[in-house]
Regions:
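Long, highly hydrophobic alpha-helical transmembrane signal-anchor segments
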Residues: 2-49
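Small-residue-rich segments of transmembrane alpha-helices in multi-pass membrane proteins
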Residues: 7-11, 144-158
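Core segments of transmembrane alpha-helices
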Residues: 8, 39-42, 85-101
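Transmembrane alpha-helical segments that form the membrane-embedded catalytic/substrate-channel core
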Residues: 37-55, 123-130
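Cytosolic, membrane-interface loops and tails of multi-pass inner-membrane proteins
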Residues: 50-81
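Short alpha-helical packing/oligomerization segments
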Residues: 96-124
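Interfacial loop-to-transmembrane junctions
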Residues: 127-151
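Juxtamembrane boundary at the C-terminal end of a transmembrane helix
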Residues: 155-167
């Protein structure tokens, strides 16, 4: 059985190599993709919340006060709601950082340091954060939250450093 998994592992590795190549074809690409993928994470956070609402007997009359049904959600559904809200908060911090880095690259050229890995890692960490929060795995959730916030901070620092150095 382990031998049968080898082609799958090789295919996944080749896919990841090609994906990284696609995401880094131009100096600005990682930051643009980071912005797009981070927005995708916000949209993805709706899925577990929608699943939870479907178990809480959501009706059209709940549209009058959608937050009022929160108490009817199962515990994991309440965590899904919090994860969804936190996704918006993380995006509002990350989007300006990604735009700043994108602007810095367009004005000054490629950024140094950890800017590209931070730009690509932030959406991945935020995507892992969602199931970690919904499944109530605090250590993983905390690591993903801190890692994503650190990636956003790196983008702010590298973008500002480039713009200040070029001024």
């Amino acid at each position: 059985m382990a031998i049968q998994a080898i082609p799958i592992v090789i295919a996944i590795a080749l896919f990841l190599v090609n994906l990284i190549d696609l995401l880094t074809q131009t100096p600005a690409a990682p930051y643009a993709w980071s912005l797009v993928l981070s927005g995708g994470v916000v949209i993805a956070s709706i899925v577990p919340l929608g699943a939870a609402r479907s178990q809480a007997n959501f009706t059209m009359s709940d549209m009058k006060a959608p937050r009022a049904m929160f108490e009817r959600l199962p515990a994991w559904g309440q965590r899904a709601s919090w994860a969804h809200q936190n996704s918006f908060e993380a995006f509002t911090l990350h989007a300006p950082a990604a735009l700043l880095a994108l602007l810095a690259v367009l004005q000054m050229g490629p950024l140094g340091g950890l800017a590209i890995p931070a730009a690509l890692l932030q959406p991945v960490l935020r995507l892992v954060y969602l199931p970690a929060y919904v499944a109530n795995v605090p250590p993983l959730r905390g690591l993903c939250w801190a890692g994503g916030l650190s990636c956003t901070g790196i983008l702010y620092l590298e973008g500002l450093r480039a713009l200040i150095a070029g001024a």
